[in-house]
């Protein structure tokens, strides 16, 4: 049986945080992402990444959207989803992120497939990979 619907595309990724505006300001200041939209009540803020959108939404918005909302970050363990930011200078971008308040999870390293990557955790608990293009 073939799929009878048109192919889907990735529209955006939403990361739930305590303060979406603070998260978007951090990503603008630290990674140079451009703010794209913000809800007047501060419950949602969206960034333009060039290919798709990265958004931040409040836990309260998740609670309002569906029963049970989403899990809050575990301070001892990153979540099971990561945001990957692509840079030609992984080492430099990682230094900037650490200076801005991120926590290092894995220093920049060259992978067998030729990509250079580092793993950090942002101040809001999000797992972030900084990597060269694939």
Label for each model-derived stretch:
Residues 14:
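Polyanion-binding surface elements
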Residues 17-19:
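Conserved beta-strand-loop-alpha-helix junction that forms the acyl-donor binding cleft
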Residues 22, 91-92:
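Alpha-helical macromolecular-interaction surfaces
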Residues 23-28, 97, 125:
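Conserved active-site tyrosine of GNAT-family acetyltransferases
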